[in-house]
Structures are given as structure tokens and as C-alpha cells.
Amino acid sequence: MEVSRVRALRGPNLWSHDTAVEAIVSCTTQELDIAQLPGFEARLRALFPQLSPLQPLGNYNAAPMAQVLELAALGLQAQAGCPVTFSRTTPTLETGIFQVVVEYSEEAVGRLALELAQQLCRAALDDAPFDLAGALHQLQELDEDVRLGPSTGAIVNAAVVR
């Protein structure tokens, strides 16, 4: 899996009214269906047990690695306490190329979550360790550093509404 052209969507956009990180993700032939990767999902769940289901119930379509990246980036932010709920993976016209969009509350946190999600996927593929507690701590620390405080945030939000 290769991630290219990561960009921040800083307002209402094609995908959502919320801010989001958009990435172009290239998957190898084997990564187009994670069911074809023996033991991958079990290793992934061992590394990140709180990860949401990789496929909705009743959906029997192949789940590409890009979708795993999407759910991992969203899940890492949510576990770190960020108020995020939206993500989407859409195939492009080119086989194996996907657009991955993940909501963020703070841009730096969203970008870091995408990087950490890549590391998580790579660790699950390689059957290597992944420091989940460290990753969540990193995201929480960054979120606290860049997020506006409650009173400043209220002032900024009121100004934006005007």
C-alpha cells in the first residue's frame, strides 16, 4: 500500500461539511481484498482491538487495504478522544487506486492519525509490534497542543458564525 497526495479539506467539501484529510492510496493486487491475506485481520485486531468492523454485516464485497487504512485512522482519532465520525473510501477509475477521506477535528491530528494508521497496517502485514498506547498518547498530546481552549474556541466559533 502506498499513500500519496495527502491534502487537508478545510471546510465543506465533496465528501462532508466537516474538515477532512484526503489521501490517494494505491493497493497491490493482494491488498485489493484483505481476505486474501492470511491472518491479516486477526493480527490487525490483536494490535488494535477497538477497530470497528472492516465490513458492515451483509456486505460480501472485497475489503481493500485502503478501507482498513480509513477505519484505522478514524478509529485512532476516536480512541484518542477526538470528536470524529466520518470517513469514506472510494475507488477511482484506475484499478487499485482509492480516495480515502477521514474527518479530523485538528488538521495536524488528522495527518498524524493517517501516518499512524499506515504504521498499524504495515505492522499487521509484517506481523510486527505496534505501540497502540504510544500512538494514542501521541495523538492526545498533539490534540491538546493545537486545539483551542473552551473559551477561545467559543469566541472563534461565534466569530465564524457572524
PLM features per residue range, with description:
Residues 1-162:
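Preference for protein termini
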